[in-house]
């Protein structure tokens, strides 16, 4: 056992606040970090301690400064770091730096982050686990000719994907040979900018697909469970905007097979801590295919928490300290005892202008009135009257999660809740 007594969250806004809450309930002292541009952000005031990182004028780089964050953690007696999502959450160098400093990284081990960070290596892992994968290139393409050859073998349409990325960036759908050159150059450029690597690979594109993902949780002793599935098919620009749990109108046999496939991948990888295995389900054939594993907490983890009653972040902190899933504090020793009750739905209130191609908006919120009521959960960042929304970070303002006995009831809760919101000063 390696107890965590003081936890630094290497992140900002709503996910930092979310982690602080679970840590506080476990009696763990919390530490926030904030960039100069985030000096008025709410998350810094929700922790027991808060420290400035980086330099003025470098807001993103401040949260990516591995050496600076680890040095700060050591200087202030931190013995655990939770990376949240985004930023350094999937960076094996960060996890390695934490380990070298004697700090527990709340997430998978370094080798696993390295494997899962390479989408082609992750495809190989799924194949070894006996899980179906989409037809595609076994490794990144080396140029236009290589991409064209593979695309012709697969048949149009195909999709180009960043080999070392995610979040919808570095992805392009190509419906014919005349589109390939421009799409390849664009995907490689975006991938290089976002992930530091221009490597992309080619997959067959499923035109009518559902995006289904399974929540996993593993301990350091080889035990692994799933917490059922989520449907994340409602997307914009390959990025999720609405998530549901459980997936509605999914054939029970398909649901069971997908959850079993996720467990098979997790066991093959010897997965530990929280992670999500993502699949595409062909709406025409009912067949499903592995996409990737996200080795971190997900934005949409709240819908799973609502239908299972399980605090996933709390379990992350416990298993990182060495607790077994079967320990009373964790309470997940028996897969059959984990139940899904009711339905949950999440949507995101963002500071984007719907009349201007959803471009991010920023400025001072002159008014903010949130909503609540039966079946509603709000996970907010810097959301209050007078708050300043800066142009430097993600536009997410509040995650709204609704729970009901059915999806229809949850949808009714969330519609009423969104109508109650009043936000002025920035477009939403």
Predicted regions located by residue number:
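Short, Asp-centered acidic motifs that coordinate Mg2+ and/or phosphate
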Residues: 49, 80, 158
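Short gly/pro/ser/thr-enriched loop/turn and capping motifs at secondary-structure boundaries
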Residues: 38-42, 58-60, 88, 111-115, ...
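N-terminal glycine-rich "phosphate-gripper" loop used for MgATP/nucleotide binding
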Residues: 33-35, 52-99
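A conserved helix-loop-beta module that forms one wall/lid of the active-site cleft
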Residues: 99, 103-163, 170
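Short, glycine/polar-rich helix-capping loops at beta-to-alpha or helix-loop-helix junctions
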Residues: 33-49, 90-91, 119-122
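Well-ordered alpha-helical segments embedded in enzymatic catalytic cores
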Residues: 3, 65-68, 146
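ATP-dependent carboxylate activation and anion-phosphoryl transfer catalytic cores
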Residues: 2-36, 50-52, 74-76, 92, ...
């Amino acid at each position: 056992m390696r107890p965590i007594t003081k936890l630094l969250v290497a992140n900002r806004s709503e996910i930092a606040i979310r982690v602080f809450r679970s840590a506080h309930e476990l009696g763990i002292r919390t530490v926030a970090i904030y960039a100069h541009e985030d000096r008025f952000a709410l998350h810094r005031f929700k922790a027991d301690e808060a420290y400035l990182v980086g330099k003025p004028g470098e807001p993103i780089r401040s949260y990516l400064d591995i050496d600076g964050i680890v040095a700060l953690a050591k200087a202030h007696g931190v013995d655990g770091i939770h990376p949240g999502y985004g930023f350094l959450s999937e960076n094996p160098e960060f996890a390695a730096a934490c380990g070298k400093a004697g700090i527990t990284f709340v997430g998978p081990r370094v080798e696993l982050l390295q494997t899962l960070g390479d989408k082609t290596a992750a495809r190989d892992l799924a194949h070894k686990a006996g899980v179906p994968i989409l037809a595609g290139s076994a490794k990144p393409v080396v140029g236009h000719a290589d991409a064209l050859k593979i695309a012709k073998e697969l048949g149009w349409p195909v999709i180009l994907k960043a080999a070392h990325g995610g979040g919808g960036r570095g992805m392009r759908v190509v419906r014919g040979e005349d589109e390939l050159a421009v799409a390849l150059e664009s995907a490689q450029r975006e991938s290089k900018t976002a992930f530091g690597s221009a490597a992309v690979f080619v997959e067959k594109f499923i035109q009518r697909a559902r995006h289904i993902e399974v929540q996993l949780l593993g301990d350091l002793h080889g035990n692994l469970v799933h917490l059922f599935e989520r449907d994340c098919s409602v997307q914009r620009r390959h990025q999720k905007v609405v998530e549901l749990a459980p997936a509605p109108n999914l054939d029970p046999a398909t649901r069971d097979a997908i959850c079993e496939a996720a467990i098979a991948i997790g066991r093959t990888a010897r997965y530990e801590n929280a992670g999500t295995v993502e699949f595409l389900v062909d709406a025409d054939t009912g067949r499903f295919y592995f996409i990737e594993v996200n080795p971190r907490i997900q934005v949409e983890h709240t819908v799973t928490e609502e239908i299972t009653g399980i605090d996933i972040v709390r379990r992350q902190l416990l298993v990182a300290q060495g607790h077994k899933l079967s320990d009373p504090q964790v309470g997940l020793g028996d897969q059959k005892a984990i139940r899904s009750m009711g339905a949950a739905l999440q949507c995101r209130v963002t500071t984007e202008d719907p009349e201007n191609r959803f471009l991010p908006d920023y400025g001072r919120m002159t008014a903010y009135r949130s909503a609540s009521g039966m079946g509603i959960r709000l996970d907010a960042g810097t959301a209050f009257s007078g708050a300043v929304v800066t142009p430097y970070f993600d536009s997410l303002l509040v995650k709204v999660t609704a729970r009901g006995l059915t999806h229809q009831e949850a949808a009714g809760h969330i519609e009423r809740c969104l109508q109650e919101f009043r936000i002025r000063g920035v477009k939403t």
